[in-house]
């Protein structure tokens, strides 16, 4: 059990983490920008570290500042919350280098699951059912061949994409050819990775998430909700 945890986030998620830490008897360290100096997450924390002025890039996304705050306060672990640095491979690796526990996956896992095509490969090896799809494509000619095997409609997807950016639905070969380079360009400009793959498009699909928690000791728990 940790005695002190730094929360590399702000707002509601930081407050929720602070409440949980308090119930567990663990001290919390908040970080904050000038704009957030009067925020509830700063007030509720046992300690708070000022990150300076500027945008999120200058404060909450500054890996070196967050690591320094943890070292200076003696925090043994960093909880990233969601967003910000929670899926940042470099940040997780920096925590490991400084013997600070990152409350989340290790850097190698974040790297693997941060790219959709490698996540698909891992799922396939674990015999998890998947939609028909491909690995990374070498070009539009390969995309045309693979789309015929999958069957239209298909989606061109950026492997590093997120937030709906870098996805195009293609109903036929002409739409696939017209969209391919555009998706690659979007992926490169938004995620610094032009890699794309194909996946079968399901009309009127529903998005369902299941929360699964696991620790380094092999213990796994799921959280499910029943709607009456």
What spans do the regions from the language model cover?
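N-terminal beta-alpha lobe that positions the nucleotide/phosphoryl donor
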Residues: 1-228
């Amino acid at each position: 059990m940790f005695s002190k945890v730094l929360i590399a986030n702000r707002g509601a998620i930081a407050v929720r983490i602070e409440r949980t830490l308090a119930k567990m008897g663990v001290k919390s360290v908040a970080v904050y920008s000038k704009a957030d100096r009067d925020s509830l997450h700063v007030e509720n924390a046992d300690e708070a570290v000022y990150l300076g002025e500027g945008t999120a890039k200058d404060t909450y996304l500054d890996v070196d500042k967050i690591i320094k705050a943890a070292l200076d306060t003696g925090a043994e672990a960093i909880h990233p919350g969601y967003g910000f640095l929670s899926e940042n491979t470099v940040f997780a690796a920096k925590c490991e280098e400084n013997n600070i526990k990152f409350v989340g996956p290790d850097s190698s896992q974040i790297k693997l699951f941060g790219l959709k095509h490698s996540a698909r490969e891992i799922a396939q090896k674990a015999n998890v059912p998947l939609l028909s799809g491909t690995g990374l494509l070498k070009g539009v000619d390969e995309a045309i061949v693979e789309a015929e095997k999958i069957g239209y409609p298909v989606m061109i997807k950026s492997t590093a994409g997120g937030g709906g950016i870098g996805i195009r639905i293609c109903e036929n070969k002409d739409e696939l050819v017209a969209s391919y380079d555009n998706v690659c360009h979007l992926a490169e400009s938004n995620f610094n990775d032009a890699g794309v793959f194909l996946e079968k498009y399901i009309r009127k699909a529903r998005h369902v998430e299941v929360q699964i928690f696991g620790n380094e000791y092999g213990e796994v728990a799921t959280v499910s909700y029943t709607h009456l």
